[in-house]
Amino acid sequence: MNQAVWLPKLYPNKQWSNTLSQDRETITENEIVDGKFKKMNLIKGPVLDRIVFAHYKNIFGQTVYKFYGVYRTDIGASNKSGQHIHRRISKKINLSSYI
């Protein structure tokens, strides 16, 4: 299995600006250096699919984790935009594969 678990922050912070599209199908990842977006390095591949448990702050200010699905990096869109673009390929994961 070529997968990794990713726990991105989906709220503003000093190191990363990760945004989830309204339909939850795309995560856009930007690194922040000295308060500015840094152009991300080109991706040459192969890349691991990401099992995403994003953390975000709920209405009480608590950090919570939520499963969003399995995402695959869109190398073409990422290299073109200078951001890392991840597209959802599955809303489910079969945990029996990991036992």
Regions found by a protein language model. Give the residues of each.
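Acidic, glycine-rich low-complexity segments with interspersed aromatic residues
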Residues: M1-V64
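Compact mixed alphabeta submodule
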Residues: G61-I99
